[in-house]
């Protein structure tokens, strides 16, 4: 299932946002750093996909296009009450794992990135922000399939001269 219009977006963030939005109105999407998320989560009342502003990455230059490979952190967080015994929060962690699975499935279906497969480590988030949230954070290897076209011509003038 390729998301309509997603190929026209030039940034990794726009592609991630489009995937998150395709998951329905029951999921909030945030793109910001952890400090901004700390403030924003105060007003959030539903499970959220938080794409943390990447601190670094790699640009892969080839003849006709550039592909972006950001170092990503994507949080799957839900507001929670502070729970000392952890029973309720364990249930929320499992729900956020399911949200992460749904997100990765949608990401793979978008065909904007190389397939995410294999073992993907996660970190459990509990009492990490000022607002009580519970969830997980994945560091997903987002590798663009198409990237950005930087050369509209199919061949170079030098290549045509050599063939003569």
Give each language-model segment a name.
Residues 1-64, 152-164:
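Small/polar-rich, solvent-exposed N-terminal microdomains that initiate assembly or binding
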Residues 1-21, 64-69, 76-105:
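Extracellular/virion structural assembly segments
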Residues 20, 24, 44-49, 93-145:
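Acidic-leaning, charged glycine-interspersed low-complexity segments
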Residues 60-67, 127-131:
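Short, solvent-exposed beta-strand/turn "edge" segments of beta-rich domains on protein surfaces
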Residues 61, 81-83, 147-151:
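Intrinsically disordered, low-complexity acidic/polar segments
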Residues 134-164:
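Hydrophobic secondary-structure block in the mid-to-C-terminal portion of proteins
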């Amino acid at each position: 299932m390729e998301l309509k219009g997603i190929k026209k977006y030039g940034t990794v963030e726009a592609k991630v946002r489009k995937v998150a939005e395709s998951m329905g109105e029951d999921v909030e999407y945030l793109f910001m750093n952890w400090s901004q998320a700390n403030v924003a989560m105060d007003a959030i009342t539903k499970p959220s996909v938080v794409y943390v502003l990447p601190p670094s990455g790699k640009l892969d230059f080839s003849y006709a296009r550039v592909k972006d490979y950001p170092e990503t952190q994507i949080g799957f967080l839900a507001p929670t009450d502070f729970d000392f015994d952890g029973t309720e929060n364990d249930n929320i962690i499992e729900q956020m794992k399911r949200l992460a699975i749904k997100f990765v499935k949608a990401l793979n279906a978008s065909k904007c990135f190389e397939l995410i497969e294999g073992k993907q480590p996660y970190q459990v988030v509990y009492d990490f922000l000022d607002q009580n949230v519970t969830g997980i954070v994945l560091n997903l290897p987002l590798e663009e399939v198409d990237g950005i076209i930087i050369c509209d011509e199919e061949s170079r003038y030098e290549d045509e001269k050599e063939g003569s």
